[in-house]
Swiss-Prot record:
Keywords: Ribonucleoprotein, Ribosomal protein, RNA-binding, rRNA-binding. Residues 67-90 are annotated as: Disordered. Binds to the 23S rRNA. Gene3D superfamilies: 1.10.1200.240, 1.10.1650.10. It comes from the Archaea. This is Large ribosomal subunit protein eL19. Part of the 50S ribosomal subunit. It comes from Archaeoglobus fulgidus (strain ATCC 49558 / DSM 4304 / JCM 9628 / NBRC 100126 / VC-16). GO terms for molecular function: large ribosomal subunit rRNA binding; structural constituent of ribosome. GO terms for cellular component: cytosolic large ribosomal subunit. SMART domains: Ribosomal_L19e (SM01416). HAMAP family: Ribosomal_eL19 (MF_01475). One of its GO terms (biological process) is translation.
Amino acid sequence: MMVMDLSLQRRLAASVLKCGENRVWFDPAALEDIATAATKQDIRELIEQGVIKRKPVNGVSRARINKRKLQKRKGRRRGHGSRKGAKGARMPRKRMWILRIRALRKALRQMKAEGVVDRRTYRILYRKAKGGEFRSVAHLKIYVEQMKR
């Protein structure tokens, strides 16, 4: 079998099918018939016969992305090797402060309601929390325990 140059036919078929040349499919069994086609009309006839067809558009699979998203939802892919931004870029210092101070104030209110601390102590601890003295709620509770001794 000799190799035929079907670039003209491919170009004409692409024009008729209104697609790119890469999406034009030729039936391997009818390459001789295709080689004889020289006009767009010849190409149209071959398309009607089903010898020339337009291939479907190739999509890009989202399987890998979906799998990665599922892993992230499970809390994976968060180790040191996966981090790009600085610590402050991933969770801004202000946002961390807001979360911490809200938790501390909630814990303080609860302690006051339960009678663990009186009004005066509550106010002192509230100000200390505002000043950034406590790292966490656990740190605050340790401080209160030591204060009682």
